[in-house]
Amino acid sequence: MSLYRPVVIGSLELPGNLFLAPVAGYTDHAFRSICAEEGACFSFTELVSAEALYRNIERYGLSTPKANSSSSPSSLPVSPCGEKNKSNAAAINLIRRGENEKRYAIQLFGAQSESIYRAASLLAPLKPDAIDINCGCPVPKVVKNGAGSAMMKDPSCIGKAVEIAVRASRESLGGIPVTVKIRSGWDSSSINYAQCAQIAIEAGAVMITLHPRTRAQNYSGRSDWSHITDLVSRIKVPVTGSGDLYTPEDAQKMLKETGCAAVMFARGAMGNPFIFSAARSLLETGSWQPVPFSAQTSVVMRHLEMLAASIGERTACLEMRKQFCAYTKGIPGGAALREKAVHAETIADYRSIMQRA
């Protein structure tokens, strides 16, 4: 049987098991749309602060919902941020559905369950297909506030966050699935992914994504896929595996070795959205073909044009620089292209750079 197969996450049915991870600074609506074109079956927004979202709803293009129950957050004070339109557009692009995304989840983080409830309750206009609670981010500015992987130090916090997100989903979002992303643990002396996953499931989570590194490891060393294998054997909801997926062969190996339901590409997809179609080809046929540079050029320009349509050409060209670095990593003459891109200020500038590559 093919390793490429459908995945059922609560009430959500997905046609395949190749997912795009939330990656801060990269997985905005334009990149997620590109990845969907290339075969990503499910994608996640960059992590969004629940606190920031509900306190700055205008910036995110949302509005306070009308009260429809005593538990509605509509009567709670909200502070509009007053940002300029371009800043607002950038924020909106973090959480809105991409042009070609058929299925996507909005990922929230926050140490306070009340913040998660309020934020999740505002998401109905965006029509996400799931809410994902980030309990694995190792970044200091997230962890210092007790969110992200810091929640694994007190697994009961994960349960509270999931429970309140499920409640918000039921009351305001039609009961869409709530999922959770975790790590192996805080450090090597506190490997507690199984406990955290079980608590999340008891609170209502219907999928667990495991990045099998500790918070102390950050992204160093090798991820321990045996933790994924173990978790699959312990729980009944789908487990999505993440960590060290850089090639189609890596995806094939993880699915075979761990028995996970799906794989989630993160750094391996940055600048390489083609990894999804390549991985599907390998899983279904046993082989895959590299994408010609001409196709890569076309994707780079389409990505830039989508950004420009939403945040303006000048801002898009600045934002594209980091994406361009990822797209040109490892190709002949890539360093020279990246040097030229530093000075690119228009779509025409980027097109000229790519045509001369």
Please state what every model-predicted region is.
Residues D154-A161, V299-V300, M320:
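Hydrophobic alpha-helical membrane-association signature
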Residues S2-V8, V23-S72, P80-L122:
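Glycine-rich, positively charged N-terminal anion/phosphate-binding segment
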Residues V23, V48-A50, F109-A111, G136-P138, ...:
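Active-site beta-loop-alpha junctions enriched in small/polar residues
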Residues L18-P22, S43-T45, Y104-L108, I131, ...:
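Hydrophobic faces of well-ordered beta-strands that scaffold small-molecule active sites
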Residues M1-G10, L14, L18, A24, ...:
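Alpha/beta catalytic cores of nucleotide-metabolism and tRNA/nucleoside-modifying enzymes
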Residues L53-Y54, Y60, K141, N218, ...:
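Short secondary-structure boundary/hinge segments and terminal tails
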